[in-house]
Amino acid sequence: IQGTMNRLNIFMDTFFNENSLYEDGSIDKTLQTFRDKGLVYDKDGAVWFKTIDFGKEKDTVLVKSTGEPTYRLPDIAYHVKKLERGFDIWVDVFGADHIATYPDVLSGVESLGFDSKQIDVLVYQFVTIVKDGKPFKMSTRKANFVTLDELMDEVGEDVTRFFFLMRAPGTHLEFDIDAAKEASEKNPVFYLQYAHARIQSILRKVAE
């Protein structure tokens, strides 16, 4: 993923591996802290977080009956670890398929004594790839999808970045590949580049 992000001129100082939360015991430690504070209980072989106490209609499973944590527990453990590092503000990026998850994560952070107001949550909607006027049907289960690298290979890094920035994170984006490759006013990037070139030409003439 680092190489892909670099192509878009997005650079990260640090990458974090979720597996380390299991290896260093952070997840077990977080769960034990929940138990010590009386925030969880066992039922039907699973561990439940008392999210009703935080305004939800029902409690939420943190550990399945199989012993496997749900998304929420590692996410909470990661948030605790990051908040302990002393950052004043940070940004969470969630996909729309996890829109029901992040409120529980914030509740977990609050219940452990941290201020969730430091966390700015961005929820990104899905992107629909359109080609030849038709949506490209994607399915990760069927391994039928277009990668970001493939998209950049076809339309270029600058165009890809611009198209994604045209929409707010919570707005669904239809990425029209044909429009992105067109050298006309139908392509907003081409139009912008043309306007920039014209402005530069005017500035050069003024300087003369």
Task: Go through the PLM ranges and name each one.
Residues 2-206:
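Alpha-helical recognition segments enriched in aromatics with Gly/Pro capping
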